[in-house]
C-alpha cells in the first residue's frame, strides 16, 4: 500500500549527513533508501559466497562504507515499496537456519565495527548461535572478540535452540 510517506523516523531537520549505522544507533527507525555512487560500492569487498547458502545481509557493504564515508540525507520519498507477506522479515528464522555461515560472517563484521556496547553484545550472542547452527567448532578462535565470545557462548547456545524451536513451529504451521 502506497502512503507516500517516509517509513519510520525521518531525519532531524538540521541533519545534513550521517552514516547508516550512526542514524540507527541514535534512535532512527524504518527502511531508508540508500543511493551510493558506483565507485563507492565497488571500493569495498564483494559479498562473500558460502556453499549452499543464498543469503547475506545487504548491510554488509553499508557497514564497510560507513567506515569511510557519510551519506547525504533527504527527507523525501524516493522509492515506493510494497512489502510482501512472505517477504524477508517474515522468513528470518528460516534464513538463520539455512544460512548460518553467512549470518556468522555478518556478525563478525558487526563485532569489528560495533555501533554500541549493547549492539556488540547482541551481535556476539548471535555470532555464537549462528556458529553453533553452522557446526563451526572454531568459532571462538575465529572471533574478532574472543573473550566476549566465550562469555556469550551460554546465551548463544540458548538462542540457537530458540531458532530451532521457532523454525520447527513454523514448519508445523504449513
What are these regions (language model features)?
Residues 37, 58-61, 99, 103, ...:
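Alpha-helical structural motif
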Residues 118-119, 150:
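Short, solvent-exposed coil/turn segments at beta-strand boundaries
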Residues 79-84, 91-117:
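Catalytic core of nucleotide-sugar-dependent glycosyltransferases
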Residues 120-130:
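Structural register within alpha-helical repeat arrays
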Residues 131-174:
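Membrane-interface aromatic/basic loop that binds lipid-linked glycans or pyrophosphate carriers
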Residues 3-90:
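Conserved nucleotide-sugar donor-binding catalytic segment
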Residues 108-111, 129, 133:
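Alpha-helical repeat scaffolds in large eukaryotic proteins
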Residues 63-64, 86-88, 94, 129-132, ...:
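Charge-rich, low-complexity amphipathic helices
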Amino acid at each position: 500500500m502506497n502512503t507516500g510517506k517516509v517509513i519510520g523516523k525521518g531525519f532531524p531537520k538540521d541533519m545534513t549527513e550521517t552514516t547508516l549505522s550512526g542514524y540507527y544507533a541514535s534512535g532512527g527507525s524504518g527502511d531508508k533508501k540508500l543511493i551510493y555512487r558506483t565507485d563507492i560500492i565497488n571500493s569495498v569487498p564483494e559479498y562473500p559466497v558460502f556453499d549452499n547458502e543464498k543469503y547475506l545481509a545487504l548491510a554488509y557493504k553499508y557497514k564497510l562504507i560507513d567506515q569511510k564515508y557519510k551519506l547525504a540525507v533527504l527527507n523525501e520519498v524516493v522509492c515506493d515499496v510494497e512489502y510482501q507477506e512472505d517477504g524477508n522479515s517474515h522468513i528470518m528464522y528460516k534464513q538463520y537456519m539455512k544460512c548460518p555461515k553467512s549470518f556468522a560472517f555478518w556478525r563478525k563484521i558487526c563485532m569489528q565495527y560495533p555501533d554500541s556496547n549493547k549492539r556488540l553484545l547482541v551481535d556476539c550472542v548471535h555470532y555464537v548461535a549462528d556458529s553453533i547452527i553452522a557446526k563451526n567448532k572454531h568459532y571462538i578462535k575465529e572471533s574478532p572478540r574472543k573473550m566476549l565470545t566465550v562469555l556469550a557462548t551460554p546465551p548463544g547456545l540458548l538462542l540457537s535452540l530458540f531458532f530451532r524451536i521457532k523454525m520447527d513451529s513454523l514448519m508445523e504451521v504449513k
